[in-house]
């Protein structure tokens, strides 16, 4: 596995490398560089594989160093687990920002190699672990790592259960329809065939795990046909866009995991 170095990370998500806090924050806020946490993860065998930061909107260029960012970490010791669940690797997913809007949050993640899907496990399966910007101890990061590591076998077991549950076409549509309601509400028509669309031969399966991954990828990558009706009855067709918001990406992932877990 080729891990990301700091130069590569800086090109994609410069906020990860920020060493100072935003000027508008009070003295109560204690700046903790994301790289300090990454160093501790590295000492424990977890290295960065993928990064992303929020898009620039209000505040312009001056806000870029403090944007919310997400870093996914993988440990080579878990590679054997990937063989048990179809080339899907357990991960630690770390989110943070340096603008005072977010603490460090550790999530359990899964990375599916065949489609480069990055999943995030719902809170009822693994409650996210937080470290606030008011004080920092190395032991807190190690506790978070241990919490994730302890829960990996349980998460793998859930995936194996999903892989073993075969879904009828009716069940697949019901799953997709509920996902649509949870994602967009009940006021928008959405093409369910697009939501369930198969993007590659490896995703033609009818087990819950494969269906879950198809829906997740289609919702996050965009391209699903939808329509809305205005106040005078005019219908407007649209295609969904790729999800670029870190918070929305995690929300959709956790929503779909919860929906899938309920169907086991």
Question: Which residues does each predicted region cover?
Answer:
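Intrinsically disordered, low-complexity regulatory segments
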Residues: 1-35, 39, 43, 53, ...
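Sequence-level detector for tyrosine residue identity
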Residues: 3, 29, 47, 66, ...
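A broad "ordered helical/assembly scaffold" signature
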Residues: 24-26, 49, 144-145
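Amphipathic, interaction-prone secondary-structure segments
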Residues: 31-104
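Intrinsically disordered, low-complexity regions enriched in serine/threonine
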Residues: 76-264
């Amino acid at each position: 596995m080729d891990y990301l170095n700091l130069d590569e990370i800086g090109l994609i998500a410069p906020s990860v490398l920020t060493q100072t806090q935003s000027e508008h924050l009070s003295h109560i806020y204690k700046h903790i560089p994301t790289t300090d946490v990454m160093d501790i993860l590295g000492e424990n065998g977890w290295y960065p594989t993928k990064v992303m930061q929020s898009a620039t909107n209000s505040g312009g260029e001056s806000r870029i160093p403090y944007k919310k960012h997400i870093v996914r970490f993988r440990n080579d010791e878990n590679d054997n687990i990937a063989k048990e669940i179809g080339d899907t690797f357990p991960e630690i997913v770390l989110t943070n920002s340096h603008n005072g809007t977010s603490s460090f949050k550790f999530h359990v993640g899964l990375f599916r190699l065949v489609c480069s899907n990055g999943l995030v496990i719902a809170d009822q399966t693994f409650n996210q672990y937080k470290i606030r910007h008011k004080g920092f101890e190395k032991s807190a990061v190690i506790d978070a790592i241990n919490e994730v590591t302890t829960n990996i076998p349980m998460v793998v077991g859930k995936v194996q259960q999903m892989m073993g549950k075969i879904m009828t076409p009716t069940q697949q549509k019901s799953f997709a329809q509920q996902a649509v309601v949870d994602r967009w509400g009940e006021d928008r028509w959405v093409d369910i065939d697009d939501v369930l669309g198969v993007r590659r031969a490896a995703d033609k399966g009818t087990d819950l795990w494969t269906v879950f991954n198809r829906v997740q990828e289609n919702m996050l990558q965009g391209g699903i046909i939808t329509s809305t009706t205005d106040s005078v009855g005019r219908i407007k067709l649209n295609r969904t866009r790729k999800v670029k918001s870190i918070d929305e990406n995690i929300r959709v992932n956790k929503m779909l995991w919860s929906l899938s877990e309920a169907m086991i």
